[in-house]
């Protein structure tokens, strides 16, 4: 369950049931209906509509129906990330002020959703373990934090309800422009250029010392950017992009996501250890810290067993071949 803060400031349990969100309601990761030779401005309009509109819908669900499923806030964070990535992918076509305002708004939504989602993930890990009863005092405190995290989500929704977010999306899409020197640019040309940049940054980050958690996190970020770019640019290329390249990058993201979950938990636990005063919670936090640190080591080892220099080299060559990118530009 989640605690909702009442008007008198008290936390009261919400009827939190883990009902799955129907797949039909979830936004597709792919942007269908695009053709390689279509003008990039048309591709941009369709892509940004498809990426931005779901944010408003998930925000409403995360605000009004959080007690029904943690999936709503999860989908809000995912849709916001995808929207920000698509906006960045077509940034040169968006008027500067529109771009800055929408990016700022999406950043606020993502931050709110991220805080709430972190609580949900950590709470689930505590309560789904075999010794859930042992962690109950800590889980209860996490629920209180989750209640606090719900308030900014609801506040943003109140500000944007009544079609206000959709109106912002329509205004932004309507203002999309193609600079004169880009008038003849096709979707595939734009996509190839954009992906070349993402691929380069991904492998550059992958060539760093990935034994360092900070550098490993940066590699994860670049991998996420590349994965989202593959999703909104995939229609410009053959099926190999969806079926092969995206699958490889997604696998890397899955393994790095596990690493990040444990690293994030350690960061939160350390902060709570410094802020909370209850001895009982201190003991649980110390115990959990040791557990998360061991799990982080295991997760890093699992990633490094999979992400080998040979795999990186082979993947780079496949990108160069399928996307017709010059291989030397992406050498580690």
Explain the meaning of each model-derived region.
Residues 5, 11-332:
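Function-determining surface determinants
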């Amino acid at each position: 369950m989640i605690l909702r803060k009442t008007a008198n400031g008290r936390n009261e349990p919400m009827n939190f049931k883990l009902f799955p969100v129907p797949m039909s309601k979830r936004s597709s990761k792919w942007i269908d209906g695009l053709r390689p030779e279509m003008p990039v401005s048309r591709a941009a309009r369709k892509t940004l509509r498809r990426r931005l509109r779901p944010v408003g819908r998930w925000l409403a669900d995360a605000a009004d129906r959080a007690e029904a499923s943690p999936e709503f806030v999860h989908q809000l964070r995912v849709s916001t990330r995808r929207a920000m990535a698509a906006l960045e992918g077509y940034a040169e076509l968006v008027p500067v002020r529109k771009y800055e305002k929408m990016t700022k708004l999406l950043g606020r939504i993502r931050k709110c959703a991220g805080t709430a989602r972190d609580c949900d993930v950590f709470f689930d890990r505590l309560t789904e373990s075999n010794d859930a009863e042992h962690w109950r005092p800590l889980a209860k405190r996490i629920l209180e934090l989750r209640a606090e995290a719900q308030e900014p989500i609801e506040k943003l929704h109140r500000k944007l309800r009544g079609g206000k977010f959709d109106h912002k999306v329509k205004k932004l899409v309507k203002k999309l422009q193609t600079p004169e020197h880009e008038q003849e640019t096709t979707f595939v040309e734009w996509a190839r250029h954009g992906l070349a940049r993402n691929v380069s940054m991904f492998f550059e980050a992958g060539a760093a010392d990935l034994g360092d958690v900070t550098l490993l996190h940066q590699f994860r970020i670049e991998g996420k950017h590349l994965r989202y770019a593959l999703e909104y640019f995939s229609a410009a290329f053959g099926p190999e992009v969806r079926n092969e390249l995206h699958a490889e990058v997604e696998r890397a993201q899955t393994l790095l996501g596990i690493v990040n979950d444990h690293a994030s938990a350690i960061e939160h636990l350390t902060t709570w250890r410094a802020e909370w005063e209850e001895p009982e919670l201190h003991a649980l936090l110390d115990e959990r810290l040791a557990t998360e640190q061991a799990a982080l080591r295991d997760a890093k080892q699992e990633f490094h067993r999979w992400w080998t220099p040979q795999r990186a080299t082979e993947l780079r060559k496949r990108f160069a071949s399928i996307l017709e990118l010059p291989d030397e530009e992406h050498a580690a």
